[in-house]
Amino acid sequence: MTEFLFCFSCCIGEQPQPKRRRRIDRSMIGEPMNFVHTAHVGSGDTNAGFAMGGSFQDQMKSKGGYTPGISEVAL
C-alpha cells in the first residue's frame, strides 16, 4: 500500500499559492493625471436633469463615448 502512495506523490507536485495583492495605502496614491472635469452631479442634480428634458444626457453625449441604455427612437 505504501508503494501505491509513493507513486502518486512523485507525480503530483504542490499547487502554487495564489499571489496576494499588495494592500494599497494613501502614500501609494498620487495626484490624478489627465483629469478633465466635465460636469458636477450632486444629490439634487440628477432629478433636475431628468425634469429639464434630459439636458444632463445631452451634455454627456457631447463628451463622446456615451451610449444610452434606451435609444431616442424608443422614447
Curated annotation (Swiss-Prot):
Record PROSITE patterns: CRIB (PS50108)
Record family assignment: Belongs to the CDC42SE/SPEC family.
Protein name: CDC42 small effector protein 2-B
Keyword Cell inner membrane recorded: no
Cysteine disulfide partners in this protein: none
Lineage top rank: taxon: Eukaryota
Lineage of the organism: Eukaryota, Metazoa, Chordata, Craniata, Vertebrata
Domain CRIB: 29-42
The UniProt record lists the keyword Oxidoreductase: no
CDD domains: CRIB
Protein source organism: Xenopus tropicalis (Western clawed frog)
Membrane topology term: Lipid-anchor
Lipid group attachment sites (S-palmitoyl cysteine): C10, C11
Keyword list, A-Z: Cell membrane, Cell shape, Cytoplasm, Cytoskeleton, Lipoprotein, Membrane, Palmitate
Subcellular location: Cytoplasm, Cytoskeleton; Cell membrane
